[in-house]
């Protein structure tokens, strides 16, 4: 029989109607003579009743049924008695009187409860992912992902973009994370790489006159994983010709507005706020600040420059800084022991200590209060807008450590003090990034974004004299403290690209060998162009209110980049290795 309704969509208006439903058994209850079955499909649950008064055959089948059996149920929709109405489900006012129950397939007892409140460990859920996906919250997340992707496609189609696929087997490049390599059977000893992004190909599409490109692109990076990282991930990849930075930012904002409207039914304010990279680091201690709450960092270096507290004075004298955050009204909540724990937390980010003061009436009290003159205390009170009951936390060190420690502490306190509105979506642009970052250990510069980012025009001469001072025409989109994506205007002239390669330590031969095809393409009339790439997995995570990226992906990898379901990666046969002209050499400790 053909299905007539999905389980969660049988309406009250169907009372009296004969229906056919198909799905899985969520729960079976035998009440002595009557058997109740909660039948579930991807839309929800409906209650099925097997009664000897209606069908002895259906009752006999229901007696055999167990959790997760697959059924086809034929019966009549009836209204529930008022006292049995279930307001927690969409079909709670009706039930199905079963006239025929067909067991399509049986099921072993699942290793965990197929429900949103399951207590199964994540590794068990990942091993039996096909069961985990039956949980309503997992299906809803995948459905949201589909809706977001469809909205993006519809929006970009309306803006005259073409969706174009770029190669998955490409060339390994030395910048960025480690590549996943694929050996070539046809070319012994040579390798393809899986793309870390379609960056070069989308730029070549601009050279090719496409002008407006996008792709829901699969990308691969062999890097250490965190809760919001995966070895294979999906990005919304966009490139445009003949544009300026404001054009891409405007397009992205309009696209995000459409996505949020489709996903959550709300309108988000535009334009998004914008701050520079330097301002983000100064005010929030982060290049991806969560602006849903205040608790900003305040520089008090000049106030304490000549103080008797040598930890502060010495830090300023040696070129560092002293910054503080004011946790309003938090002094009574944090004991000395609690503050010591905050100090240990700050120590994980390089801070050598966490100094503190509490505001009690008109006085500042704490272990370091005695070191400050009345004038210095008054200046601190003004700078930090101190009121009775405030807790002041200080870090003194080099700028990078101060930013890292206080930035992390700010987020921790924001959560502990309930300052974050979890329902809010706070988009933010971070602009004016440095083009290059210097690695002290390796003694060379790295691209802050990638080697194809256009420098600010006036800064191009500095590539050869003072690379650290060069600004990038780059921009990151941040949402609730997560980097949602980044973009830039691109280099489109060969001489500028060659200067960039030299600043990154490439010899002329290395640049030609790795990127000769791109440099040559720039000699054939390349238009000015730029773009952005937004993390789809992360966007879904944030809009779904999840905290783990793995919950937004149908078949994700673990933190060790393995698949517990298929047991990938795994060994291959000697014959396969021989065909690829490869031999496995394991590390000695293995």
From Swiss-Prot:
Cell compartments where the protein resides: Cytoplasm
GO biological process, one term: aspartyl-tRNA aminoacylation
Alphabetic keyword roster: Aminoacyl-tRNA synthetase, ATP-binding, Cytoplasm, Ligase, Nucleotide-binding, Protein biosynthesis
Name this protein carries in UniProt: Aspartate--tRNA ligase
GO function terms (MF aspect): aspartate-tRNA ligase activity; ATP binding; catalytic activity, acting on a protein; nucleic acid binding; transferase activity
Catalysed reaction equations from the record: tRNA(Asp) + L-aspartate + ATP = L-aspartyl-tRNA(Asp) + AMP + diphosphate
Protein role: Catalyzes the attachment of L-aspartate to tRNA(Asp) in a two-step reaction: L-aspartate is first activated by ATP to form Asp-AMP and then transferred to the acceptor end of tRNA(Asp).
Subunit structure: Homodimer.
Originating species: Geobacillus kaustophilus (strain HTA426)
Listed InterPro entries: Aa-tRNA-synt_II, aa-tRNA-synth_II, aa-tRNA-synth_II/BPL/LPL, Asp-tRNA-ligase_1, Asp-tRNA-ligase_1_N, Asp/Asn-tRNA-synth_IIb, AspRS_core, GAD-like_sf
Family of the protein in this entry: Belongs to the class-II aminoacyl-tRNA synthetase family. Type 1 subfamily.
A matching Pfam family: tRNA-synt_2
Cross-referenced CDD domains: AspRS_core, EcAspRS_like_N
EC numbers, comma separated: 6.1.1.12
GO (cellular component) term, any one: cytoplasm
Signal sequence residues: none
Keyword Ligase: yes
